[in-house]
Amino acid sequence: MKRYRLHIWPVWLLLGMMFLAACQSDALSGENSGGAQQTTVRSDSSYINLRIVNSNATMTRATEAATAAENAVYDGILCIFEGADESSATLKTATVIDQLINNPGNSASVEITQRLATGTHAYGTNLYVLALLNTTSTGFKVSGNDLLFDDSSQKNKTISQIQNLVIHSVGSTDKHIGLFMSNAPQSGYIMPEISSDCLYDTEALAATGNRLTINVERAAARVKVTNAANQIRNIRLNPRNGDSETRHPYVHKITWSLNHYNTQSYAIRTGFTAAENWATSVNYLISFTAKDFSLYPQKSLSQDVVYIGENTTGTETEVIVEVQLKDNSNMLMHECFVFHPYQDVYSENTYHDLFTSPEQYIAYLRDELPPENKGWFGLGGTDNAEIFKYATVKIDANGNVVFSLTNSDFTTVQQESLNNLANFLSNHTAGFRDGKMYYTYKIKHSDTQNGVVRNNAYNLTLVDNDVRQSMSAIGRPKP
């Protein structure tokens, strides 16, 4: 019986190469590039040697590589296609890789011998290999020698048909392990071909002979947010509370979510297979239409990593950071307000006064409202105490500030002026519900292009002295 040896290498180990050698010795060569070959395959053998290599090496454009646990392989399916060339080859058999179950490949190298399904023969045609790794919850499973997706047989399907299947989930995110992986498309092809040079009569010969390599990649990008922020320096807390020193709010904790991202993950990356546009160029060619999906939150407040399905290249994927403020050791859990009559409160690099209760804010306006603000509304000669005698301010269900000014002693004309002033104050006040502020950051996979790339890892560090990723400036009142 002839046997061949198969190695699956994660694509993050080979981003500098991004090519596939269908059959090779210890060093990778680029001589075989998939697609149609002239070799006639005699495949009476039914064993493979599968090697999975995990790497912690930093990837291209990734600020932090995924961990070994995130790259671990917990189960796998090996799919064999048969045909004259890759585009016309159809799926013949699928085999569960038994020894991967409950035996995750967390080490640098894992060698597994696996028997293929019987009847894997090709005389005058070619065989091609597709690996599906960490398939739990994706929709894939094996019944006999048949690959099922949503309980529907994929037998005799082409690689393009398999490629466009939208998987249910990229895998486990509660423990950050077991992310779905499959073939990483190379320049001009997706699946490596099994040539006769990779087939051996005995298992011993296969173990020391040529080997077949498949590059694989995760179906998700990894995003991590780290909080290194302390004070928010351009906010002064309750400047009229009698304190002689200027106080600034502190960052108590952050939570974060993703917005504007693609929720679909395909079995294999779709769109193009040119390696030069994937591994080395800053001008990726795939783009998706940005949609405003529901926020994709952290699994829990104790975790700091989320995963984005498929590519969002060219779209504005955002990290929305929610910051809970505190005053020294006291949490700011009530409605807070900032008055900005002359400028956009979010773009000025100057102090802004934040009032931590409606009462504090109304007291400030009663004592400090500039005369010109009153004059705009015909109230220049009216005492501030009368203007704000029955004032109320609140944040409505939509996060908007609503001011109300009334005085039963005022004439109808004066009351109309009060209403106009109240509308002005509503439109020039930022209201922060429960002492929370929001910061939005775009994710970029190059200096000029928004979006994320499948299989990459992104790390956003929030600090209080970095202009580009700063929490020293005031945040938005709502996401």
Label every PLM stretch briefly.
Residues 42-51, 467-478:
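Short, intrinsically disordered, charge-balanced linker/junction segments flanking boundaries
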Residues 14-17:
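Alpha-helical transmembrane segments
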Residues 2-12:
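Bacterial N-terminal signal peptides that target proteins for export
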Residues 29-60, 217-231:
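A short, Gly/Thr-enriched small/hydrophobic beta-strand-prone motif that recurs across taxa
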Residues 98-101, 138-210, 436, 441, ...:
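Structured interaction patches on ligand/partner-binding surfaces of diverse proteins
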Residues 59-144, 215, 222-457, 463-464, ...:
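Tryptophan-paired
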Residues 19-22:
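C-terminal motif of bacterial Sec signal peptides marking the signal peptidase cleavage site
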Residues 24-27:
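Bacterial signal peptide processing site
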